[in-house]
């Protein structure tokens, strides 16, 4: 009898699991449920679609229900939400969001790839029509349309993480004046403070107003705009606020099914990506992972690890015995004409974990050219390297520069 596998959620982890499983098992019945309209898209490209760097949304769509069906014989059901898991009878309850019709589907193996959602804090005025978040293709469409219809000339970004920084650049590209508000004393938390100063300098040189160490206490709507009230008493007025303060795992389905979760709501999995129920796997932003450096538990919502997890889960469903080694957290972001990349742990994390500089680790910060200085076009880059005092282990690295950042961070990441 052929195995029946149900996958809940598409995009990175779910779609990868489905495609890889089909390559390993030609006979399995594979059903993928996705509550949205799109099952596989480049979510990292959404800010660049808003900024018209990627003008066509079709370029963001990696797979469609039709392509997955024709190429991999996968039964894709979009706009259908799995609302309940009956672990005892190995069934899921499904609601068709277009027709409100409800149904029940059985499974042999279940994969949860429910992803994450933007954090919406409980701040007065947060539900304003002027406040947007960017996480899906529909979000990008909505923001693009709003900017054009309302001839937006200024905006406020709340949060200086990857999405906040990329949206800042892309709104400036559209000629929009941007203020960036960050509760911490720096943007880009994966970078240490001294390295983040180079990012601050780049942002300010490109006309971005920074409000660092400043939280938002409330939002107040006026007749034609919204006031962003900051913790230091300042008020900033605008007609467009982009909220990008982080994400939370979509683990409500797992919680209602009684699966083990961590304190942040992440699904607990073993090295084979099985949950506390051996017939249920989980991958992507929704799971707790092992930090590759510290070996502690953490949450790292990145597309690259989600894809790797999808491949490993598919292999194990097909009878292999692969293990996920943990997430290193390598990432890179473009900030106007500069690239900033990191891999492994930063110094803040080492100190938090009890390591002592000079005893447990050393750091090296150097400035070097992107290529030989005698050849025209070389540009400077800053490199911070964290390593054990005996020189046998690299803990992490951060690099900021205009050229050659990617290949250097790749090399260090591989060495780690």
Language-model-detected regions and their locations in the chain:
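Beta1/beta-strand and adjacent pyrophosphate-binding region of the FAD-binding site
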Residues: 1-11, 152-161
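Mid-to-C-terminal Rossmann-like scaffold of FAD/NAD(P)H-dependent oxidoreductases
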Residues: 2-4, 286-404
């Amino acid at each position: 009898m052929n195995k029946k596998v149900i996958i809940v959620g598409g995009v990175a982890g779910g779609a990868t699991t489905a495609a890889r499983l089909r390559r390993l098992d030609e006979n399995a019945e594979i059903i993928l449920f996705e509550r949205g309209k799109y099952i596989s898209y480049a979510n990292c490209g959404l800010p660049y679609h808003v900024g018209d760097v990627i003008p066509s949304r079709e370029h963001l769509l990696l797979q469609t229900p039709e392509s997955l069906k024709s190429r991999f014989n996968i039964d894709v059901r979009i706009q259908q939400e799995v609302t309940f898991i009956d672990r005892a009878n190995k069934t899921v309850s499904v609601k068709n969001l277009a027709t409100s019709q409800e149904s029940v589907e059985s499974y042999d193996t279940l994969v949860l790839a429910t992803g994450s959602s933007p954090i919406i804090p409980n701040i007065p005025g947060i539900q304003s029509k002027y406040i947007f978040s960017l996480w899906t293709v529909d979000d990008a469409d909505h923001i693009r349309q709003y900017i054009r219809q309302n001839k937006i000339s200024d905006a406020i970004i709340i949060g200086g993480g990857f999405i906040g920084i990329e949206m800042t650049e892309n709104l400036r590209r559209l000629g929009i004046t941007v203020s960036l508000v960050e509760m911490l004393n720096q943007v880009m938390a994966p970078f240490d403070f001294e390295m983040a100063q180079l990012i601050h300098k780049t942002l300010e040189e490109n006309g971005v107003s920074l409000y660092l160490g400043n939280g938002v206490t409330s939002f107040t709507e006026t007749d034609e705009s919204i006031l962003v009230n900051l913790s230091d008493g300042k008020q900033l007025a605008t007609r467009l606020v982009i909220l990008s303060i982080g994400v939370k795992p979509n683990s409500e389905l797992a919680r209602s099914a009684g699966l083990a979760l961590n304190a942040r709501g992440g699904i607990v999995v073993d090295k084979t990506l099985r949950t506390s129920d051996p017939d249920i796997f989980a991958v992507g932003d929704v799971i707790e992972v092992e930090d590759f450096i510290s070996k502690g538990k953490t949450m790292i919502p990145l597309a690259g690890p989600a894809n790797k997890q999808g491949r490993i889960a598919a292999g194990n469903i097909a009878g292999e015995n692969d293990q996920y080694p943990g997430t290193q957290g390598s990432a890179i972001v473009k900030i106007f004409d500069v690239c900033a990349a990191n891999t492994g742990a930063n110094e803040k994390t080492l100190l938090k974990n009890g390591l002592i500089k000079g005893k447990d680790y050393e750091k090296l910060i150097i400035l070097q050219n992107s290529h030989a200085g005698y050849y025209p076009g070389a540009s400077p880059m800053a490199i911070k390297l964290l390593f054990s005092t005996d020189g046998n282990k690299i803990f992490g690295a951060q690099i900021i520069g205009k050229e050659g950042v990617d290949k250097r961070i790749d090399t260090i990441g591989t060495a780690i």
